[in-house]
């Protein structure tokens, strides 16, 4: 397919996860890759747009006010947003012809893709526009959705199972009008998780795998949600850090703690890193025996 103007080929690679129950291989497209040190990446050439999503901590806190919480997400959300035909040549990629492996085909995306700088803005703008159209017919639910959306995730609920079921049903109806499918429903009221789509079958997703989620738990915007006890928890990475300044900084930085629940614990790790910096050691130099002892106790 000959290009008619601007043109960019996005590199991609396969990510293999042998332990996954469903998708063992994912294709990752890297729009931040550069051809060389002086060439800009595709993302550097694009305007990321306005920040339209809600604040993460606000969505999480508001969801905790409901006695009955529900959480779902939009199925393949970015791929539901179509790109103008005149812009699609910037989303080209190479693909090996399965029938003739010696041939390489040039394909292009017709919809927004994950990892593209403007994709969150394009998705957020599409959702906001659609909700504005639906507002006259569903004023209460639209307001609820607007406060509970974070990119493609919806957190909502009610003080009773009946109210939460009503919100869930109306939200599915609203998004369905724009061909968005809400799926992967989770709730602390298990009867609300029953679905009529094969797409919602439970399994060890990548998010669950990363969080080390157990049966009855799921990922809630990156936190581990125990639906039976209705508690959320912070996950600490299990891998052993190198006993260097770089190693302990990497370990502390991997603790995802958006609500500050584990602040008292992470503070100790940060203080150890501060002490390592004050000793003016190189990034990969071994820590002193005193700091190693403190780190191992932490």
Model-based region annotation:
Residues 1-298:
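Conserved acidic
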């Amino acid at each position: 397919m000959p290009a008619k103007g601007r043109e960019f080929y996005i590199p991609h690679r396969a990510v293999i996860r042998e332990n996954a129950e469903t998708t063992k291989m994912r294709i990752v497209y890297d729009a931040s890759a550069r051809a060389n040190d002086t060439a800009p990446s595709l993302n550097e050439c694009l305007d990321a747009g306005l920040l339209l999503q809600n604040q993460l901590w606000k969505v999480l806190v508001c969801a905790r006010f409901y006695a009955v919480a529900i959480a779902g997400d939009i199925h393949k959300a970015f791929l539901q947003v179509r790109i103008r035909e005149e812009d699609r040549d910037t989303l080209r990629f190479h693909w090996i012809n399965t029938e003739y492996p010696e041939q390489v085909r040039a394909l292009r995306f017709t919809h927004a893709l994950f990892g593209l700088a403007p994709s969150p803005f394009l998705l957020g703008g599409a959702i906001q526009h659609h909700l504005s159209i639906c507002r006259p017919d569903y004023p209460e639910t639209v307001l609820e959705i607007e406060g509970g959306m974070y990119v493609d995730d919806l957190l909502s609920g009610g003080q009773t199972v009946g109210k939460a079921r009503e919100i869930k049903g109306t939200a599915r109806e609203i998004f369905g009008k724009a061909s968005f499918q809400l799926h992967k429903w989770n709730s602390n009221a298990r009867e609300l998780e029953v679905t009529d789509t094969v797409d919602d079958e439970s399994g060890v997703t990548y998010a669950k795998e990363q969080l080390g989620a157990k049966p009855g738990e799921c990922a809630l915007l990156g936190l581990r949600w125990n639906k039976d006890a209705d508690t959320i928890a912070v996950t600490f990475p299990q891998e052993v850090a190198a006993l260097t300044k770089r190693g302990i900084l990497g370990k502390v930085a991997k603790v995802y703690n958006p609500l500050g629940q584990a602040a008292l614990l992470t503070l100790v790790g940060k203080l150890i890193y501060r002490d390592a910096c004050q000793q003016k050691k190189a990034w990969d130099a071994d820590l002193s025996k005193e700091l190693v002892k403190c780190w191992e106790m932490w």
